[in-house]
Amino acid sequence: MIKHLHDTHFHLDLQKDKHGAIENITKNEIYTITMTNLPDLYQKEVSLYGQKYIRIALGFHPELVHEYPNKITLMWKYLAEARYIGEVGLDFTDKSHAKEQIAFFSELIARCKNDSNKIISIHSRGAENEILDIIGTNFKFTPILHWYSGTMGNLRKVCDRGYYFSVNSSMIRTKKFAQMMEYIPSDKILLETDSPFTSNKISHVESLKIVNEFLESHGIDCWENFLKLIGA
């Protein structure tokens, strides 16, 4: 079986050179789930960029929910058709708009809870307890925790509930990730870049190769995990 690279958390809409990014993805056959930060961008990107190697996710970044409440109805409009959801979640770096974030994320989870076809990439910075509480233990969608930075206690809870984790090149250099590796099941680890937010000055494909090779050295087959994720 031919093994490909994949990227479960990428921001095509924020790339300086979108067409160059698409060419790179296609040339290197990188199966990519690209996030959107607002729901009106989703339909635009599906029509312009959706193809074999690019899956467009419907998203509403938590830090933007309070700024664009008029766009929430668009999220619900497109939700039924979108298999991939992201970037969504909670960000409590600044808690001044936590109430709006919680209300939106709670409604999103309620609408997706029984949909086994949905794959949701979740942002959880500083809000892991709330994420766990809102999602609970009774859900049919597939959650992916993107760039997890929470406690080991919450990590164990997340692992027990069957979440996936997406891992980037900035994460694998940390002592914390070495600790995380002791708990995360090997069949629940996926690749991501979070490009353009990762600080490493390397190409999209090189960033993925570095992480993939690191994980392979620990006996983790991320490509097999990705195929399982998408049901291929």
Model-derived features: positions:
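Mid-domain alpha/beta scaffold segments of enzyme catalytic cores
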Residues: 1-232
